[in-house]
């Protein structure tokens, strides 16, 4: 009879042999009855409303529709024509007539499922039911493997699924070992020659189970013939193996090693057989449970009422099913098993889509049922089920390879978000859980709009939520809400920020005002309301960056004396402010925006629409598919007709057709459609107020502290680079010039150029104290723009750039799709160099140790300068690069390549263009700011501040960016953000005399601190000098001293007088003093027994023991002269060590012993005797800095 080939919907061609060996590892197939399988219960449920699964305010819940239910249905639709493979119900023999009876019953399925209106295939998101057929097993032949085929026909798609014993061939207890070896052997042959096996599969697909008993007889004959052939082949293989063993017995040592290697395939076969048997037994149970679960869910859905007992029964079945799914997946994907078995397990999981079935059938189905009965069911059922699935999934992902766990990260977030609606009593916990798992998923998944959207609904940081919402509508797999729904979600984000205004964060008021005005710019009526536009502009010009106390973070004169908390707030949120304005400029999902068209947003919207239509057509018969193909062909013909007849169509009609195509997504946007007039017309859809506000915010950040300006300007530079790169790909020269004019006029180039020159000056002033500057400049100087971008994209470490990944505009620079990683936390494979940048707090990007010590500041600064330089070289943006050395300060040593780098600007008169279309563009896009004479004069000395005529070196609080004595508190702890601000430094204009004395003392210690850090400081050597703490210091800091001694960072000595004083203080009436003295005594004794503290007598000699007390018996008045005894001991020890040591060449006196005390009277007495005295703050600060350099813990 003629052969026809029908594609199996669950078959992956490259994995057919593994699927075959999984199903055909049994003896000869036996016919069996085929009971009817019910239709999936999800088609019996009603639609879910968004308000049930969306974190929205109660007032807005009624306006939402079908969000999470769409997620559930979309998850189900991804399983194309789902099929549960058949299993054996019993081991009893079945006769052939039983099979004939079943075939007759297929034409008349159970009325309970056919007559139900809820079971009808009317919804577009329903999944077609495939007809299951007998899986014909074919044993391995001489040149092939065991192939199991399931015959599927699109005409029978609506018929109920059949379950037969022959549909899945399991390994019976009596199966012989030879058949098991055939399975693994066939898999190996398949791996080596997949094309040969695919050819054999195609020839075997021609059988159709639905024809008649003749086909079944043919199948049986074919199976018998294959068995006979296989037995012959096995005999030959056994003979060959025997000969091989005889030869190996006569070989030498090297051949013995080869013999050992030849045994490995046999071992692989045995382990593979064991794995397959285990998975088959699990699969039997899984399919039984799937059938029972679907039947019970269907009965419960069709019934008018529900009993609690029925829900708990379904719960028990479903939880067991989930457990078996998880066991199946972890068994198949166990990383510790042999590689051969892991490959087998991976292919079995992929072919049978076990992971998808776990999610859709094991999780979504019951949640769907629970949603319908949420009003009158026991909430404990929902709670227990969600918790059980959540724990099972979160535990499973730690036991499987990372590339399989990435998908489950997002699904755990989805499950947590669904739990918010189904189990609202734990709203906060599930919301935090959803945010955590979505955050983990976003480390690996990019360009996925639904993920960004779902993250925005649960994210605590409302500014980041606003950015993620913008990314969801401007990425490749874009999320496409209606304008009304988008406005609803934006309003919800603002309301969340407003509700949290009193949570103790004083900066929330700034965020609330920003979100309020950003939301206003996205209103549909905003472009038609000049008054509202003026209100928004006034806010960004006059109020943005000013707190309730009137403190302006963007006042250039105060850039070095900013409040550290205020500084870190804008540092953490600066990148989000930039991304927010960029996403608003590109239209926030408006496809007719010129930037959206440039970055091909309509193309991805059409691809998404076509993908949906293909999914719909896949649920229909093949004729519908052919019809859609014909329609697609007709669309292409229409495109050709339209483009060929443009001469007869007016420009107005052509533009109308162009924008109509964008709205309807009827045809793709071809490059020939992007005429000059079309580009000009798109400017009507550009929110000019939003563009102006973004430029205002950028200019404000450039006037602020350098530390917060860099994280904000870097996304803008990347955005400008992406515009230039994308526009350079346009074929029309006028269109290229169109975008260059927009770039020249829209951005604040005068402020940007001045900022770059000031940044260069600042780097040159710090190059001597920060060697990293020279190293970075040497590395970046020899790279072009493309090489720089490639370098950073392959090893990104800045969180502000990582946040831009996934957007369409960043895809122009480097497309970041979903990546698979080979090992856990190996982020280098996806281009992330510093994975710690991913662990950002909820309050913006992370301000970590590398930011505290300035390392990332220098990396940001050098990257900004060299990217800006190469951007100016590569594209005609109006920036001129001068390489003439210009002297900025007399202290500069122009050994760095930055010493000869200066940025200048073309005059504004050079921007004008005589082309009419471009002239019209100039009347629409205003120049963002005028250009100063200093920046246009190629020979003028650049400005030293963004404020014309100012000098940053004369600003209050200016200092070099390095850790000095003022960066540490009284306990020696580093003060956060102290590198960037002198907020902590006392004011020299104090009227209090004591404060002035302290200020002068601190100023003296600043220079000494920087000298002590140097290894060649002539007065103190940390390997030789002994540090002697007084009793008060031991009482306060005994634990800190113990830590320093254990790390051998310093050498310590102690006067016996101090030790005896501490012993005496153990009898103090003050409990705090008593406890501190006891701790000090214990610490000193421990250090003494470890030879880490040196005891000194009154005479300066080393005592024989720390408990020595002979001198105290002789000097009974020591208690009244403790300070004098300590000073005397230190002075004599210094003299003895000086006389015993070799003379030093340095004219400055070397200090062998240094006294550490915070007692001003004692310090004054010691200084009178020329004893070097330091404070505990100085010593601990010094140790903190030295510990950082040596990677030692000092606290």
Swiss-Prot record:
It is found in: Cytoplasm; Nucleus; Peroxisome. Residues 1-10, 18-35, 55-68 have a biased composition (Polar residues). Residues 83-109, 197-208 have a biased composition (Basic and acidic residues). Residues 1-38, 55-130, 179-268, 610-643 are annotated as: Disordered. Signal peptide: none annotated. GO terms for biological process: nuclear-transcribed mRNA catabolic process, nonsense-mediated decay. InterPro entries: PIN_dom, TPR-like_helical_dom_sf. Residues 210-252, 619-629 have a biased composition (Low complexity). Residues 1025-1164 form the PINc domain. One of its GO terms (molecular function) is telomerase RNA binding. Keywords: Cytoplasm, Nucleus, Peroxisome. GO terms for cellular component: cytoplasm; nucleus; peroxisome; telomerase holoenzyme complex. May be involved in the regulation of gene expression responses of environment-sensing pathways. Transiently interacts with PEX14. Present with 195 molecules/cell in log phase SD medium. This is EST/SMG-like protein 2.
């Amino acid at each position: 009879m003629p052969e026809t080939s029908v594609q199996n919907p669950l078959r992956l061609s490259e994995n057919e042999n593994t699927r075959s060996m999984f199903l055909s590892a049994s003896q000869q197939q036996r016919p069996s009855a085929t009971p009817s399988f019910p239709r999936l219960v999800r088609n019996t449920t009603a639609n879910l409303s968004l308000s049930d699964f969306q974190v929205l305010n109660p007032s807005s819940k009624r306006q939402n529709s079908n969000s999470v239910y769409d997620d559930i249905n979309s998850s189900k639709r991804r399983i194309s024509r789902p099929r549960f493979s058949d299993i054996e119900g019993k081991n009893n023999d079945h006769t052939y007539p039983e099979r004939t009876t079943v075939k007759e019953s297929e034409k008349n399925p159970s009325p309970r499922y056919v007559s139900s209106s809820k079971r009808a295939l009317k919804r577009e998101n329903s999944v077609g039911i495939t007809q299951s057929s007998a899986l014909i097993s074919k044993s391995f032949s001489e040149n092939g493997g065991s192939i199991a085929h399931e015959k599927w026909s699109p005409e029978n798609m609506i018929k109920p699924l059949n379950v037969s014993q022959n549909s899945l061939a399991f390994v019976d207890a009596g199966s012989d070992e030879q058949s098991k070896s055939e399975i693994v052997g066939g898999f190996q042959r398949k791996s080596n020659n997949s094309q040969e096996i695919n050819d054999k599969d195609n020839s075997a697909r021609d059988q159709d189970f639905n024809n008649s008993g003749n086909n079944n007889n043919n199948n049986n004959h074919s199976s018998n013939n294959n068995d006979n052939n296989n037995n012959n082949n096995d005999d030959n293989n056994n003979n060959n193996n025997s000969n091989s063993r005889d030869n190996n017995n006569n070989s030498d040592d090297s051949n013995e090693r080869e013999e050992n290697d030849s045994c490995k395939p046999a071992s692989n076969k045995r382990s593979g057989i064991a794995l397959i048997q285990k998975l088959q037994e699990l699969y039997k149970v899984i399919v039984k449970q799937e059938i029972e679960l679907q039947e019970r869910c269907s009965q419960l859905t069709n019934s008018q009422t529900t009993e609690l007992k029925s829900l708990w029964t379904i719960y028990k079945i479903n939880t067991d099913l989930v457990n078996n799914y998880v066991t199946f997946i972890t068994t198949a994907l166990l990383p510790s098993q042999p590689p051969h078995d892991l490959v087998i397990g991976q292919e079995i999981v992929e072919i049978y889509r076990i992971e998808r079935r776990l999610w859709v059938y094991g999780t979504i189905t019951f949640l769907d049922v629970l949603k319908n009965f949420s009003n009158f069911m026991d909430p404990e059922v929902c709670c227990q089920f969600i918790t059980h699935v959540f724990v099972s999934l979160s535990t499973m992902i730690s036991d499987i390879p990372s590339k399989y766990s990435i998908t489950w990260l997002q699904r755990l977030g989805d499950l947590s978000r669904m739990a918010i609606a189904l189990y609202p009593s734990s709203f906060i916990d599930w919301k935090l859980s959803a945010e955590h798992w979505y955050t983990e998923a976003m480390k690996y998944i990019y360009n996925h709009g639904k993920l960004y959207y779902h993250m925005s609904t649960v994210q605590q940081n409302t500014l980041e939520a606003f950015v993620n919402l913008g990314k969801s509508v401007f990425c490749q797999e874009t999320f496409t809400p209606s304008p009304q729904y988008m406005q609803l979600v934006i309003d919800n984000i603002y309301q969340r920020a407003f509700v949290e205004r009193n949570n103790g964060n004083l900066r929330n008021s700034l965020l609330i005002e920003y979100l309020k005005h950003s939301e206003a710019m996205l209103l549909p009526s905003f472009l038609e309301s000049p008054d509202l536009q003026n209100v928004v502009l006034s806010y960004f010009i006059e109020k943005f960056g000013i707190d309730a106390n009137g403190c302006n973070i963007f006042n250039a004169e105060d850039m070095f004396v900013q409040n550290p908390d205020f500084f870190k707030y804008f540092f953490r949120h600066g990148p989000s402010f930039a991304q927010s304005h960029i996403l608003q400029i590109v239209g926030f999902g408006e496809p007719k925006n010129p930037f959206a068209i440039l970055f091909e947003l309509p193309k991805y919207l059409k691809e998404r629409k076509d993908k949906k239509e293909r999914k719909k057509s896949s649920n229909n018969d093949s004729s519908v598919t052919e019809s859609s193909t014909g329609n697609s062909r007709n669309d292409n013909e229409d495109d050709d007709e339209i483009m060929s007849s443009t001469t007869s169509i007016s420009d107005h009609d052509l533009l109308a057709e162009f924008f109509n195509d964008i709205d309807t997504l009827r045809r793709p946007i071809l490059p020939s459609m992007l005429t000059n007039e079309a580009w000009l017309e798109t400017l009507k859809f550009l929110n000019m107020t939003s563009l102006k506000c973004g430029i205002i915010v950028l200019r404000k950040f450039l006037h602020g502290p350098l530390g917060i300006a860099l994280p904000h300007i870097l996304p803008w530079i990347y955005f400008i680079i992406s515009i230039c790169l994308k526009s350079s790909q346009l074929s029309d020269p006028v269109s290229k010039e169109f975008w260059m004019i927009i770039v020249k006029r829209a951005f604040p180039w005068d402020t940007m150029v001045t900022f770059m020159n000031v940044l260069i000056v600042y780097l040159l002033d710090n190059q001597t104290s920060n060697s990293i500057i020279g190293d970075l400049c040497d590395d970046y100087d020899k790279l072009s723009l493309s090489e720089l971008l490639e370098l950073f994209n392959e090893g990104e470490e800045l969180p502000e750039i990582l946040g831009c990944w996934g957007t369409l505009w960043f895809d122009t620079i480097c497309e970041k799709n979903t990546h698979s990683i080979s090992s856990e936390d190996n982020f280098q494979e996806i281009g992330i160099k510093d994975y710690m940048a991913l662990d950002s707090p909820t309050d913006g990007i992370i301000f970590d140790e590398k930011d505290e010590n300035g390392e990332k500041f220098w990396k940001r600064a050098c990257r900004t300068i060299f990217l800006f330089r190469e951007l100016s070289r590569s594209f005609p943006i109006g920036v001129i690069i001068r390489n003439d050395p210009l002297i900025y300060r007399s202290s500069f040593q122009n050994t760095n390549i930055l010493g000869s780098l200066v940025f200048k600007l073309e005059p504004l008169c050079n921007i004008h263009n005589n082309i009419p279309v471009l002239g019209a563009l100039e009347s629409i896009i205003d120049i963002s700011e005028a250009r100063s004479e200093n920046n246009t004069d190629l020979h003028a000395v650049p400005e030293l501040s963004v404020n014309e005529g100012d000098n940053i070196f004369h600003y209050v609080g200016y200092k070099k960016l390095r850790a000095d004595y003022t960066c540490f508190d009284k306990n020696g702890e580093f003060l956060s953000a102290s590198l960037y601000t002198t907020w902590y430094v006392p004011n020299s204009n104090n009227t209090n005399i004591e404060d002035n004395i302290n200020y002068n003392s601190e100023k003296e210690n600043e220079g000494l601190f920087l000298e002590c850090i140097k290894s060649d400081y002539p007065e103190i050597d940390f390997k030789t000098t002994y540090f002697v703490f007084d009793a008060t210091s031991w009482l306060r800091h005994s634990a800190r001293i113990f830590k320093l001694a254990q790390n051998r960072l310093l050498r310590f000595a102690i006067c016996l007088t101090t030790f005896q004083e501490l012993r005496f203080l153990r009898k103090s009436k003050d409990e705090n003093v008593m406890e501190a003295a006891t701790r000090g005594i214990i610490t000193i004794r421990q250090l003494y027994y470890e030879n880490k503290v040196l005891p000194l007598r009154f005479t300066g000699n080393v005592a024989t023991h720390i408990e020595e007390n002979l001198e105290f018996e002789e000097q009974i008045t020591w208690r009244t002269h403790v300070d004098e005894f300590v000073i005397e001991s230190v002075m004599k020890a210094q003299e003895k060590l000086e006389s015993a040591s070799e003379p030093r060449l340095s004219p400055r006196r070397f200090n062998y012993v240094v006294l550490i005390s915070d007692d001003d009277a004692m310090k004054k007495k010691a200084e009178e005797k020329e004893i070097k005295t330091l404070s505990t703050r100085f010593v601990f600060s010094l140790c903190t800095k030295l510990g950082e350099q040596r990677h030692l813990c000092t606290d």
